[in-house]
Amino acid sequence: MAKKSKVKKTLVDQILDKAKIDHDSLSFNGLEGELPEDVARESIYKNLALNGDKTGPVIGIVPITEHLSEKKLAKISGNKKVQMIPQKDLQKTTGYVHGANNPVGIRQKHNFPIYIDQSAQEAGFLIVSAGEIGRSIRINSQDLADFVNAEFADIKE
């Protein structure tokens, strides 16, 4: 009888397990192909890393179906303007490659301000990257915000 292959936990899963924060591990690529039946595209959030002119790096988390308002994020984060960190500098800044940025891992390594669009708070949960491409977590929005010291705000266009 063949052994059932067990999916290896990501570092984000391990951190959340150690902190006893309830979450579901998911394996799919939200930007490509079919989604699992129980996953709505609007519940998947992207983690965007930007540079503020006053604060330095700042993280904005919005649904993949929406666009981030740089103007709103700048205002809420105490900057005059923010701009996306160039992809070539992303891993050096956050520790993650494009598509694997996640609030849990970033908070463990850096003290960057993190802002989550208020739509996640209204929905009650969100799906974000688990630190590896093709791996995600479904987590209670407030639990995530509390754990990574994030603030909910209106940051989408």
Where would I find each of the regions flagged by the language model?
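Extended, low-hydrophobicity, polar/charged segments
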Residues: 1-157
